[in-house]
């Protein structure tokens, strides 16, 4: 593909896009914009931030996006829950203002102003492909193809305007493939485009692609200093740890089978 792109990843997207738009105004040409979102992606897992994990599992393509654009070092997420976080990104408003404050709410109010709607008004063709998780159907998009609810890692269901079908394959590969197909053949190439590529990964419960099962078989990941914390003299912290173990499915994440 030979696309002029302004790339963004999760919480790194808008500064490069704005810079590209400034250049576009100077040239009289509007840039294409791709917003790439991963799910529950820890900062420490991106090697551009310099965490020791990055030496074991480097992320060179993510790093390149930051090196060619901007990296945020002092920022926050206004809502860390899946659906509400997406609603905040779409609207630029906190959850109590956009009305979507928790998952499994009544549904996102798609009648309000959003980024894709503004770009449509500016002559952009818009699309969202991948995880949506806002219950109501997407608005402000010329094309949308979204996962059913959280989506599945293997053979996921995709929803389009009139159909829900199972697609054979691994979800990250499929979302990437469908985004490429839309950019190559599914859009009006006389218009600039705005594409939201919303990946399910790396949301728990983790299921890697089969080809990656042994990718880190011999790697040794550094443990944090408090990994074996006994919580001596800190009863409240100990109880909170027990709640995390019970409520956050650590056993399932570690592929532990109950006897």
Report the location of each language-model feature.
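Formylglycine-dependent sulfatase
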Residues: 4, 8-9, 18-259
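Repetitive helical segments and hydrophobic/amphipathic motifs
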Residues: 11-13
């Amino acid at each position: 593909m030979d696309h002029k792109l302004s790339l963004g990843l999760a919480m790194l997207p808008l500064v490069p896009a704005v810079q590209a738009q400034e250049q576009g105004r100077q040239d009289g040409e509007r840039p294409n914009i791709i917003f790439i979102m991963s799910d529950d992606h820890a900062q420490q897992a991106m090697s551009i931030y310099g965490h020791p994990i990055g030496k074991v599992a480097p992320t060179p393509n993510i790093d390149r996006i930051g090196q060619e654009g901007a990296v945020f070092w002092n920022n926050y997420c206004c809502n860390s829950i899946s659906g509400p976080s997406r609603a905040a990104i779409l609207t630029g408003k906190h959850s109590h203002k956009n009305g979507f404050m928790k998952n499994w709410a009544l549904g996102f109010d798609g009648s309000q102003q959003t980024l894709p709607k503004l770009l449509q008004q500016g002559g952009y063709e818009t699309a969202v492909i991948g995880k949506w998780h806002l219950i109501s159907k997407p608005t402000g998009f010329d094309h949308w193809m979204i996962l059913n609810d959280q989506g599945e890692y293997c053979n996921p269901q995709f929803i389009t305007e009139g159909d829900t079908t199972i697609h054979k394959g691994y979800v990250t590969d499929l979302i990437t493939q469908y985004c490429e197909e839309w950019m190559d053949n599914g859009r009006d190439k006389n218009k600039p485009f705005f594409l939201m590529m919303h990946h399910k990964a790396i949301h728990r419960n983790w299921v890697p692609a089969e080809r990656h099962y042994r990718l880190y078989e011999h790697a040794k990941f550094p443990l944090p200093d408090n990994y074996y914390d006994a919580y001596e003299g800190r009863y409240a912290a100990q109880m909170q740890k027990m709640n995390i173990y019970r409520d956050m499915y650590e056993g399932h994440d570690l592929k532990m089978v109950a006897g």
